[in-house]
Amino acid sequence: MSREPREVVEDFFDRMEDDDRRPTIGELFAEDAVITVPGTRFEGPDAPEEMLDFFGPPRYEWAAKEFDRWITTGPHVVSLGTLYGVDAAGEEFDDIRYVDVYEVREGLIRRLDIYNDFAAEGVVE
C-alpha cells in the first residue's frame, strides 16, 4: 500500500531541508511529473533536479519555509506559509508568502505548482 499524500509531501519537505538528503527528492516524483513555477515549467524524470537547479544560486543564496497550515483533500495537498533566507545580494528576507499545491498518486508526486511572492517583494527579478 502506498503512503498517504501528506506523508509523501512531508517527506519531500524533510529532504529539502536536509543538504545531504536534498538530492534524493527525485525518488518521490513520478517519471512523468510536472512542476510549475511562475515563468517556467519542468517535466519528466529530470523535473526535480531541474527545479533544484532553478531555485539554487545565483537566484538566491538560500531559502527555507515556515509552515502555516496544510490542506489535504484526496490526492491533493496544499502547503501555505512563508519563506525566509538570504537573497543573491546577501540581504536577508523573511515573511515572503508561498502556496505549494501537490497532486500525489500511488505514493508519488505527479504535479507540483509553486506560487510565491519573491518577485513582488523584490527578492528576485
Segments from the language model and where they lie:
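A solvent-exposed, acidic/Ser-Thr-rich amphipathic alpha-helical stretch
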Residues: 3, 22-75
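Hydrophobic beta-strand positions in extracellular immunoglobulin-like domains
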Residues: 83-85, 104
